[in-house]
From Swiss-Prot:
Assigned protein family: Belongs to the UPF0349 family.
Protein name (record): UPF0349 protein ABC2936
Species annotation: Shouchella clausii (strain KSM-K16)
InterPro entries with a match to the protein in the record: DUF1450 (IPR009910), UPF0349 (IPR022916)
Domain of life: Bacteria
Origin organism lineage: Bacteria, Bacillati, Bacillota, Bacilli, Bacillales
HAMAP family: UPF0349 (MF_01542)
Length: 78
């Protein structure tokens, strides 16, 4: 089972698209786009994704990618 990374379309339009494109290169991740993930207050402030249901954010797309991999390293699925 691979980690699931969920992105909000509104947040992608705000700059997280670069993070999603980088993560899509990793065959060990499942990337899913949704219209809304119901994090509207923080969506307007940060780049974010849900990683296995956990909210992960970053000030930049690069920081978001780094924080996602850090979370996955600290919280292995097996």
């Amino acid at each position: 089972m691979r980690p699931i990374i969920e992105f909000c379309l509104s947040n992608l339009a705000s700059g997280s698209h670069d993070a999603m494109e980088e993560l899509e290169k990793d065959p060990n991740l499942d990337i899913i786009e949704y219209g809304c993930l119901n994090h509207c207050g923080t969506c307007a402030l940060d780049h974010f994704a849900l990683v296995n249901g956990e909210y992960i954010a970053g000030d930049t797309p690069e920081e978001l990618v780094s924080n996602i991999y850090k979370y996955l390293e600290e919280n292995p699925m097996f």
